[in-house]
Amino acid sequence: MKKKALTISCIVLLALIGTLTGGSLYMLNYSLRPENRGKDLQGSMEYMMQNYPQLKPWVDSLQQHHALKDTFITAPDGIRLHAYYAYASRPSRRTAVIVHGYTDNAIRIFQIGYLYNHSLDYNVLIPDLRYSGLSEGEDFQMGWLDRKDVIQWIDTAPALFG
């Protein structure tokens, strides 16, 4: 009788461990690899223009004058990271580094860049975090490696804006 109870207990325990492990791996994959709208640059621009139509003249002007620029840096682990940047309308020492949210990209935060660049006359640097936009990466980092990347972008800003 004890042997049968022990066998059943072991089977239940193994089933429970298997279920918890499988569920945990599923949730980890779900949280680190959600639908990546951050790689859809065209869709992101359409979203911005549809939801923030006041941005169109600003973005068009930046593009027409080649004032919206791209730059890349390489993180210490070899991942290539991308950012957009734009100068203030006159030389300025004020720079805003504007960071997008989870699963987004730099384009989806242009409305904040507009406020700083157009309204407050700041230089703006808007990076694509890992696995977003034109940046490389296999997973969203949920801020862990992104914090170091943002510090690297902050250190890069003076070289971009003088």
Language-model features and meaning:
Residues 93-101:
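Short beta-strand element of the alpha/beta-hydrolase
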Residues 102-115:
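The serine-hydrolase catalytic nucleophile loop
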Residues 76-87:
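A short loop-to-beta-strand scaffold at the N-terminal edge of the catalytic core in hydrolase folds
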Residues 82, 100-101, 132:
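Histidine-centered divalent metal-coordination motifs
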Residues 5, 16-72:
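An N-terminal hydrophobic leader/cap segment in hydrolases
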Residues 116-136:
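Conserved alpha/beta-hydrolase
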Residues 140-161:
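Alpha/beta-hydrolase active-site loop
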Residues 108-110, 135-138:
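Conserved catalytic-core motifs of eukaryotic protein kinase domains, centered on the activation segment
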